[in-house]
């Protein structure tokens, strides 16, 4: 628990991503999903640049305080706290089997 409470101090960069509520439940969900897709792209880009990355959720009960600190609009859902930095060691490259491609065409 103590390690989790101080993880923000160990990363040189923390990106906070939030999604605003929509005018309908569907738009609220679409906003959240679009932000999540963008976060995945950030993580892939960070990996490409050789950075370590970690997607974490907002601490329980802290959503409104974090959103206010970030000056996000009222009602914003904190979708991710993204920790970025240079890794202490390189992760081993995992050999993957060749992709199986199926073509369906007329």
Model-derived features with residue positions:
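Short secondary-structure boundary segments
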Residues: 19, 57-58, 86
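Glycine/small-residue-rich phosphate/adenosyl-binding loop
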Residues: 1-35
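C-terminal helix-cap and adjacent tail motif
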Residues: 78-106
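Structural motif
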Residues: 12-15, 52-53, 80
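Short, electropositive alpha-helical surface patch
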Residues: 66-79
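GST superfamily/GST-like fold recognition
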Residues: 26-30, 51-64
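Short hydrophobic alpha-helices that are characteristic scaffold elements of the AMP-binding
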Residues: 44-48
């Amino acid at each position: 628990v103590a390690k989790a409470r101080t993880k923000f101090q160990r990363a040189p960069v923390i990106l906070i991503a939030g999604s605003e509520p929509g005018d309908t439940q569907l738009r609220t969900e679409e906003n959240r999903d679009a932000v999540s897709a963008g976060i995945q792209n950030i993580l892939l880009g960070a990996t490409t640049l050789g950075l370590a990355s970690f997607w974490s959720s907002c601490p329980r009960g802290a959503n409104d305080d974090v959103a206010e600190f970030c000056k996000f609009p009222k009602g914003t859902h904190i979708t991710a706290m993204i920790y970025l930095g240079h890794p202490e060691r390189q992760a081993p490259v995992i050999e993957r089997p060749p992709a199986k491609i199926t073509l369906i065409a007329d």
